[in-house]
Amino acid sequence: MSGIKGTSQEYIGHHLYHLQFDLSTFSLVSSENTSSFWVLNVDSMFFSILLATLFLLIFGRLATVATYAVPTKLQVFIELVILFIDSNVKDMFHGKNKLIAPLSMTVFVWIFLMNTMDLFPIDLFPAIAKLLGLPALRVVPSADVNITSSLALNVFVLVMYYNIYVNGVHGFIKGLMYHPFNHPTCIPINFIIEVVSLLSKPVSLSLRLFGNMYSGELIFILISGLLPWWGQWVLNLPWAIFHILVVTLQAFIFMVLTVIYLSTAHDSC
């Protein structure tokens, strides 16, 4: 329990509090002491932006120095990732849209980087935050439902845009009314089913990623909070190895569902 003193309950609770900026008082607070609705989880925002910047810098730099002669190991690895994502997009998306592959690449790598923050020692960043005088700190952006909801909402906006762009407003509304049962008497039932199905996409997309990453982070915290330091490695190491699969798989699932939703949006009603 390095860096945080107190009982196991206090230790676990402390690691679940966000560093927030209270817009009503213009001050940094812990979510433990938040009494206002108008707050921002600045730790999640900071690390998500930091990782996005890191992603852009690495890929941008590689794009300018890439060579066919003697490629570096990093270049070979990134090219493999790009080819992997490109092949998956071609298998799932059959429309004509040059945005889908770069979008899928961005979604996968960004979410993967955010998920990877869960593999750092659980006390490392909170201990640094304590030295800096910060009341709390959480470093896994994808374990914050606000971040996952924002990602899912952006996907939903794109789905709605391409639905209307491909089919027009009339065609989009017609699709809600005459699918899955193509009969005028079924319009009310069709409309309810399609609207619920449409709205459930961003909800399930965000909660799936949030739930998996939050539970993974919570298990790390429980192991560190309930066991002595010399006994933590017995459970932490195998869980960390397994969690590498979870980190990658959740980023991949989010990307796949994004492509599928956008592919469906490009289908004519």
From Swiss-Prot:
Tagged with keyword Cell inner membrane: yes
Assembly: F-type ATPases have 2 components, CF(1) - the catalytic core - and CF(0) - the membrane proton channel. CF(1) has five subunits: alpha(3), beta(3), gamma(1), delta(1), epsilon(1). CF(0) has three main subunits: a(1), b(2) and c(9-12). The alpha and beta chains form an alternating ring which encloses part of the gamma chain. CF(1) is attached to CF(0) by a central stalk formed by the gamma and epsilon chains, while a peripheral stalk is formed by the delta and b chains.
For this chain, one GO molecular function annotation is: proton-transporting ATP synthase activity, rotational mechanism
Compartments reported by the entry: Cell inner membrane
Which residues, if any, are the signal sequence? none
Its recorded name reads ATP synthase subunit a
PANTHER family the UniProt entry points to: ATP SYNTHASE SUBUNIT A, CHLOROPLASTIC (PTHR42823:SF3)
**What taxonomic classification does the UniProt entry list for its organism?**
Bacteria, Pseudomonadati, Pseudomonadota, Gammaproteobacteria, Enterobacterales
Task: Tell me which InterPro entries the record gives.
Answer: ATP_syn_F0_a_bact/chloroplast, ATP_synth_F0_asu, ATP_synth_F0_asu_AS, F0_ATP_A_sf
Described by its record, this protein's role is as follows: Key component of the proton channel; it plays a direct role in the translocation of protons across the membrane.
* Biological process per Gene Ontology, one example term: proton motive force-driven plasma membrane ATP synthesis
Membrane topology per the entry is: Multi-pass membrane protein
